[in-house]
């Protein structure tokens, strides 16, 4: 009888320990998920910034990577990528380097195409058109004979100019993950076609599918903040071996001397 009581007590103790450990792990995971979501939310607060000139006066996260006196450079990038069944992956994107020191902005409009030959080798072809930005207007810096392309460049709008994540904290059922070894983190949400941002994308791009996309937020670097890390967002409408349709966007704040445009 005494042995039976001890056995029962032992089992109860083990179960209690399992419950406590499980609770601690769950609490830690929930706290980490909330921190990841809050980290993304800090970046998403920039949406919308309708006038790109406003970035000259916007301060970003600063750390020891910034030299004394460097006001930093904002890098904004938006692009639509479409691969129809069995075809090439075609992309049209723009990147701007908004230098807060010089209060000048330069960048590129990039037309890309990725194909595979019969042997399975990948071929990447890009055509860059240099641009500058003045008074919130995109201006090609070299002559462009194709009038349609010229208008496309001049009328280009970055997602940060019209996207809006005011309800991001209310997003539910997200698949949130964290890899401490990199470190990297991500959050994925299934959206509907009624979502404001999706309606805006469909208004501006000819998206050849009615499927509602997933929103994937990706980040790397210290969760508490780092000028070395990056944060990107991606709306994935279709993703498989033969067909891909997705929109990418990023807004980063970096030391001015680290920007790829400045070093070219």
From Swiss-Prot:
Top-level taxonomic group: Bacteria
InterPro entries referenced in this protein's UniProt entry, alphabetically: Csa (IPR007595), Csa_sf (IPR038641)
Main subcellular location of this protein, as a coarse class: membrane
Keywords in alphabetical order: Cell membrane, Membrane, Transmembrane, Transmembrane helix
Residue stretches spanning the membrane: 7-27
Entry GO terms, CC: plasma membrane
The UniProt record lists the keyword Transmembrane: yes
Annotated compartments: Cell membrane
Signal peptide: none
Protein topology in the membrane: Single-pass membrane protein
Similarity remark: Belongs to the staphylococcal tandem lipoprotein family.
NCBIfam families cross-referenced by the UniProt entry: SA_tandem_lipo (TIGR01742)
Name under which the protein is recorded: Uncharacterized protein MW2407
Organism: Staphylococcus aureus (strain MW2)
């Amino acid at each position: 009888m005494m042995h039976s009581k001890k056995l029962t007590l032992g089992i109860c103790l083990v179960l209690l320990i399992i419950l406590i450990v499980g609770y601690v792990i769950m609490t830690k995971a929930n706290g980490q998920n909330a921190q990841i979501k809050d980290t993304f939310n800090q970046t998403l607060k920039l949406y919308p910034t309708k006038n790109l000139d406003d970035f000259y006066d916007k301060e970003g996260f600063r750390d020891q990577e910034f030299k004394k006196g460097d006001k930093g450079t904002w890098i904004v990038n938006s692009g639509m990528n479409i691969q129809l069944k069995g075809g090439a992956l075609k992309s049209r994107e723009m990147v701007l380097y908004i230098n807060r020191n010089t209060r000048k902005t330069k960048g590129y409009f990039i037309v890309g195409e990725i194909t595979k030959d019969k042997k399975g080798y990948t071929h990447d072809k890009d055509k860059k058109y240099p641009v500058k930005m003045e008074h919130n207007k995109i201006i090609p810096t070299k002559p462009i004979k194709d009038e349609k392309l010229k208008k496309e460049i001049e009328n280009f709008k970055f997602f940060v100019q019209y996207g809006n994540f005011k309800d991001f904290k209310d997003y539910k059922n997200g698949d949130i993950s964290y890899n401490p070894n990199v470190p990297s983190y991500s959050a994925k949400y299934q959206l509907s076609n009624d979502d404001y941002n999706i309606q805006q994308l469909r208004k501006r791009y000819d998206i050849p599918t009615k499927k509602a996309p997933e929103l994937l937020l990706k980040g790397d670097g210290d969760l508490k903040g780092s000028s070395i890390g990056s944060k990107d967002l991606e709306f994935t409408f279709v993703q498989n071996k033969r067909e891909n349709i997705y929109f990418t966007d990023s807004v980063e704040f970096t030391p001015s001397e680290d920007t790829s445009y400045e070093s070219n």
